[in-house]
């Protein structure tokens, strides 16, 4: 863009949209060379506009003297003044607010537009909002419900732009419902729906309670929003809807959104794989591509949402998310295919700059997502290789993004990624470190190196980093050098195995600090802690410190560390240097040191005196000198130390010194304070390498050092770094903490079930197959099988959805919601296959299956909920059903296993054994269970018929009945309940038929606890349905 | 995944467009300072040897690109992937270019309100809402002709 154009033709657009007065004003301002001149012009214009506005106000009541065009012109000028003054002149233009609001009321589009546009700019100021909010909201409501789409559009834009600047709109129920109404209305144009989706998002961001306050509204509105994705033909609405869903999944409730997985996968697959295939039958809408590449916007948005919905390997227990082992294999493979195609596309040569940007967008978005797909080691290593080939790219952005992506990959995928990088590309990375001139890239290189350092390569990497800091040609910002120093300190502490090397490097690092502006107390302090805690380091560190002190220029950090450590351990190196010489050394350094270091040296001196009283006269002289110090701290210290020495002399022994300056006890700070300063490294980066070597993770490094050095003393010190939690984690923990007291997921208990759900539920307890649900639109069949006879606690549940209408059912998706996903749940839902098709033709069917594995006893009322969502004939439907899996479902009938059959004597003896062992524990009684309506006129049924029906029911459940004739009115029943984690339980029951048509049940189980109750509840359900 | 703000200023640091999408600060002085800092940071960068991405604060990084004498800058969350925002910026500039016909800084100066109209058609709630250039231009020409 250059300034080749003259003023005259600068406005190419149609004439009636230009505002001549405004153009002249702007031209005037531009021709004014001096800032002062401009300022004068602005002020005179402001005065003029003020006069016009005042005049208009006086004439109120009469017809509008100012006129819409004039008003628009003046307000636009004020807006220009605001922008061009870099938003500083707010107060000078505030007088125009009233007339700006007046513009909103205009029925002329261009006037209304200028009004809204100006307010969009000014709404970032709370004083503006406070003044005009009520009036604006009123006008906003009128425009939202206007019959002119362009007015609605302006109102939606305004909400979308200022919705987050003030929460006044988001807490106005009329506005939130107004916007939502446009979003859900079948008659709104796609254009308005798109805008309303994003405006609604802006409101939701300011006020989550729009959706969370009222449960019913939450369910209803979220389903409405999700159904906007059903239109698979039109990606344009999808594009605007996904960010809204993204936000809901992240901050409101992800559980509603997990059912979108098949749809999202389909979009991604279409964009990345189908959209780019060169085959002639590539029938995909043009919109799936952009600049000859897959549509980057759709891809990044879909990937972002998928990343939220799929739990990463490290957050396995976050309940409401999808786990990779639970995702339909076909979908998982499709997603993986997308990643590999993106890598292929991303490494292709592209000429057009836009094409290259898009290429990178797609590549990095998918590569960063790949770690969520439980990739094979080979796949990871392939991604890494592809990425590393981009490190040599000429484009700086690509190198930056590649490094960023490698850091993420190494942190999330662990060893396979790390190995692939470090074994083949270390030289390359060091080369980048030394040649890059962009500090943000250098930072990424350092992060990457840090991420894959371990015991094996710590020396090479630390050496490379140290060279970088030392090299004078790297004029990088001091901040970076300081960050690198911190990282070196952490790495040496974490991975050093060689004491000598550890000490050399650490001191080298400290000695640097005077040359660069690194000023890190934390580094020398940490070193002192480590040395104190590891006796094997005492002597060697002290020796080296003396060497450093003897040099002319010792850095402040070296002096401080020396003052502290030599004070403690000088007695260990008397063969190298006498206390007297050490004292002289410190006395020399004293005068050039800053006050904090001086104070430390004073303490060192008295410690030296403690071990070598023969240097007393020098020490006393020194302290006496410092009594005159200008610094109060130094003066006080000298005075106190002098008195202590005198006291010792009077007593004739050094007891008081020994007590006051006892040897330093080991430090027990739990974590390395340096770890807080890792900066922008991803959450797990600090601990990645620890994962590979768990033995190291459990112990702490200084400790480790001493062990490796065969020290017999084991010392406690800092714990491994607490891994930082990322934002997603936090969001999830917030959500999962909303469990109710029974430990059930609140999401489960909040489901509103279909009115006649219980009928199918009861049928499912007693029958292995049948009808689960029927309505005028859909019929659902179920079938329960036990795929493996050895595992009677694992059930395969097949569902069939039949379309009963004459129309198509579209957008079919389901969710299986367990009562608990966290905290050791009673059962798990496994191997969920998504419905075989999302579209069911009239009278056609779709099928689906999943498995339930029962881990321990639970109440049948806590069975999984099946949520079915679909569209039919323009209506959006949700059916929530409970699919019964009871403890009785795990029974194996004695027809299959005759050995379980008991005779009466066995039954009685076992009953007695249970009574003796458990007493009333593990027993449950229920009397007066009324038989259901199928046994009509129960009073008239004979005992025989009643017992026959009971027998049939109980047998169908899988119980075994003892053959006996001695107690006619009672059935003696036995069975074995199976669970995965807690094993099998025996169960004995007496079911007594009363003449009045009711039944008493007494149930005993071989375990204390509520199992007996759970069994009786199943039976009661079947008998009374 | 949302744009925190869109800025456009020239080489001298004069602001041409400013749009905040979230509450950056209740203190207006702070947002003016932020703009000044962003200008200093970006104008000091070497576009040959430095990338188009730079961290700005502990909650924001900047994605920017220079077109002739104008810088277009977007502020986004630190965790966001950068390249898509370059797409945003590039598409925005392409639409401006097509709308004004070989756009230059003067077009943006004199028709700032139209540029805001274009921005509103492309970005609301910090998200991009339309990416089809044809669709955008068709809609914009209708709006531009409305009385």
UniProtKB/Swiss-Prot annotation, chain B:
It is found in: Cell membrane; Membrane, Coated pit. Pfam families: Clat_adaptor_s. GO terms for biological process: endocytosis; intracellular protein transport; vesicle-mediated transport. It comes from the Eukaryota. Adaptor protein complex 2 (AP-2) is a heterotetramer composed of two large adaptins (alpha-type subunit APL3 and beta-type subunit APL1), a medium chain (mu-type subunit APM4) and a small adaptin (sigma-type subunit APS2). Interacts with APL1. Present with 1390 molecules/cell in log phase SD medium. Belongs to the adaptor complexes small subunit family. Component of the adaptor complexes which link clathrin to receptors in coated vesicles. Clathrin-associated protein complexes are believed to interact with the cytoplasmic tails of membrane proteins, leading to their selection and concentration. This is AP-2 complex subunit sigma. The lineage of its organism: Eukaryota, Fungi, Dikarya, Ascomycota, Saccharomycotina. The gene is APS2.
């Amino acid at each position: 863009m250059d300034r080749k154009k003259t003023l005259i033709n600068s406005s190419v657009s149609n004439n009636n949209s230009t505002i001549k007065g405004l153009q002249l004003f702007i031209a005037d301002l531009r021709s004014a060379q001096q800032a002062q001149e401009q300022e004068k012009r602005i002020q005179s214009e402001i005065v003029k506009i003020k006069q016009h506005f005042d005049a208009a106000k006086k004439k109120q009541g009469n017809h509008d003297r100012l006129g819409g065009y004039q008003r628009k012109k003046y307000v636009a000028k004020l807006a220009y003044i605001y922008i061009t003054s870099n938003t500083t002149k707010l107060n000078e233009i505030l007088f125009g607010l009233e007339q700006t609001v007046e513009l909103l009321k205009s029925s002329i589009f261009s006037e209304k537009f200028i009004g809204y546009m100006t307010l969009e700019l000014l709404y970032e100021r709370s004083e503006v909002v406070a003044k005009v909010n009520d009036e604006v909201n009123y006008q906003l409501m009128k425009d939202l419900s206007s019959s002119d789409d362009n007015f609605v559009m302006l109102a939606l834009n305004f909400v979308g732009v200022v919705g987050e600047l003030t929460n006044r709109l988001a807490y106005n129920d009329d506005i939130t419902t107004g916007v939502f109404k446009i979003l859900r209305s079948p008659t709104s144009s796609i254009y308005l729906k798109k805008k309303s989706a994003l405006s609604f998002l802006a409101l939701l961001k300011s006020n989550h309670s729009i959706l969370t306050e009222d449960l019913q509204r939450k369910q209803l509105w979220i389903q409405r929003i999700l159904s906007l994705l059903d239109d698979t033909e039109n990606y344009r609405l999808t594009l605007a809807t996904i960010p809204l869903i993204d936000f809901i999944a992240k901050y409101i409730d992800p559980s509603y959104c997990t059912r979108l997985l098949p749809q999202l996968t389909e979009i991604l697959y279409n964009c990345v794989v189908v959209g780019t295939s060169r085959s002639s039958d590539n029938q995909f809408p043009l919109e799936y591509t952009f600049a000859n590449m897959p549509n980057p916007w759709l891809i990044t948005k879909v990937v972002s949402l998928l990343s939220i919905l799929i739990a990463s390997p490290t957050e396995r227990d976050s309940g409401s998310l999808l786990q990779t082992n639970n995702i339909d294999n076909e979908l998982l493979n499709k997603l993986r295919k997308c990643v590999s195609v993106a890598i292929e596309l991303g490494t292709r040569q592209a000429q057009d700059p836009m094409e290259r940007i898009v290429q990178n967008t797609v590549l990095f978005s998918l590569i960063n997502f790949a770690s969520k797909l439980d990739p094979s080691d080979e796949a990871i290593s392939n991604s890494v290789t592809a990425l590393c080939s981009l490190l040599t790219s000429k484009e700086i952005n690509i190198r930056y993004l590649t490094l960023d992506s490698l850091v993420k990959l190494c942190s999330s995928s662990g060893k396979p990624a790390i190995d692939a990088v470090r074994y083949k590309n270390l030289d390359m990375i060091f080369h980048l470190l030394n040649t890059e001139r962009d500090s943000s890239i250098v930072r990424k290189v350092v992060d990457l190196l840090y991420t894959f350092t371990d015991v094996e390569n710590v020396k090479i990497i630390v050496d490379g980093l140290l060279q970088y800091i030392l090299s004078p040609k790297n004029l990088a910002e001091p901040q970076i050098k300081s960050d690198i120093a911190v990282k070196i300190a952490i790495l040496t502490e974490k991975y050093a195995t060689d004491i000598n090397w550890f000490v050399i490097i650490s001191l080298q690092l400290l000695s640097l600090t005077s040359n660069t502006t690194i000023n890190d107390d934390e580094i020398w302090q940490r070193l002192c802690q480590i040395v104190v805690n590891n006796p094997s380091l005492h002597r060697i560190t002290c020796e080296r410190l003396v060497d450093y002190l003897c040099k002319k220029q010792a850095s402040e950090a070296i002096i401080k560390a020396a003052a502290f450590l030599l004070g403690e351990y000088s007695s260990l190196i008397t063969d190298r240097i006498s206390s007297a010489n050490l004292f002289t050394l410190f006395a020399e350094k004293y005068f050039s040191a800053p006050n904090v270091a001086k104070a430390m040296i004073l303490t060192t001196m008295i410690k030296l005196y403690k071990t070598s009283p023969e240097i007393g006269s020098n020490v006393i002289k020194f302290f006496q000198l410092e009594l005159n110090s200008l610094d109060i701290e130094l003066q006080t210290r000298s005075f106190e130390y002098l008195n202590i020495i005198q006291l010792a002399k009077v007593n004739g022994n050094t007891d008081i010194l020994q007590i006051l300056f006892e040897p330093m006890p080991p430090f027990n700070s739990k974590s390395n304070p340096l770890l807080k300063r890792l900066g922008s490294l991803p959450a797990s980066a600090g601990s990645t390498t620890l994962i590979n070597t768990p033995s190291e993770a459990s112990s702490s490094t200084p400790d480790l050092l001493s062990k490796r050095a065969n020290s017999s003393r084991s010392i406690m010190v800092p714990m491994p770094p607490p891994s930082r939690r990322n934002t997603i984690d936090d969001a999830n923990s917030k959500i999962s903490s909303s469990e109710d007291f029974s430990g059930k997921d609140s999401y489960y208990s909040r489901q509103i079930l279909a009115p006649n759900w219980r009928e199918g539920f009861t049928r499912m307890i007693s029958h292995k197959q049948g009808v689960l649900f029927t309505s005028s639109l859909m019929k659902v069949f179920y079938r329960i099988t036990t795929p493996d006879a050895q595992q009677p606690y694992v059930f395969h549940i097949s569902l069939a959805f039949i379309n009963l209408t004459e129309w198509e059912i579209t957008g079919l998706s389901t969710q299986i919601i367990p009562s608990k996903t966290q905290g050791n749940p009673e059962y798990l839902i496994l191997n969920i296959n998504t419905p075989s098709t999302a579209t069911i033709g009239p009278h056609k069917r779709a099928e689906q299956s999943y498995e339930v594995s029962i881990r321990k006893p639970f109440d049948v009322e806590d069975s999984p909920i099946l949520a079915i969502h679909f569209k039919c004939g323009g209506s959006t439907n949700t059916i929530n059903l409970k699919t019964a899996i009871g403890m009785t479902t795990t029974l194996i009938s004695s027809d299959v296993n005759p050995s379980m059959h008991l005779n009466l004597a066995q039954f009685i003896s076992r009953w007695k054994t249970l009574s003796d062992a458990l007493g009333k524990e593990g027993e449950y009684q229920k009397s007066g269970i009324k038989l259901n309506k199928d046994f009509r006129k129960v009073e008239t049924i004979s005992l025989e018929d009643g017992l026959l029906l009971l027998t049939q029911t109980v047998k169908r459940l899988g119980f075994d009945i003892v053959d006996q004739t001695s107690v006619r009115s009672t059935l003696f029943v036995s069975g074995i309940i199976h669970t995965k984690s807690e094993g099998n339980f025996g169960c004995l029951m007496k079911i007594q038929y009363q003449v009045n048509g009711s039944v008493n049940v007494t149930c005993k189980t071989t375990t204390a606890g509520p199992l007996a109750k759970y069994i009786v509840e199943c039976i009661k359900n079947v008998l009374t349905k | 995944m949302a744009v925190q703000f869109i800025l456009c200023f020239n080489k001298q640091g004069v602001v041409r467009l400013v749009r905040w999408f979230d509450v950056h600060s209740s203190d207006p002085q702070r947002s003016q300072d932020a703009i000044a800092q962003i200008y200093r940071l970006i104008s000091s960068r070497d576009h040959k040897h430095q990338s188009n991405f730079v961290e700005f604060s502990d909650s924001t990084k900047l994605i920017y690109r220079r077109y002739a004498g104008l810088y277009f800058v977007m502020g986004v969350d630190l965790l966001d992937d950068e390249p898509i925002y370059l797409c945003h910026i590039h598409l925005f500039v392409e639409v401006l270019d097509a709308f004004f016909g070989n756009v230059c800084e003067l077009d943006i100066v004199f028709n700032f309100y139209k540029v805001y109209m274009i921005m509103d058609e492309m970005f609301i709630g910090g998200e991009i809402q339309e990416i089809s250039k044809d669709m955008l231009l068709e809609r914009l020409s209708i709006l531009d002709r409305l009385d």
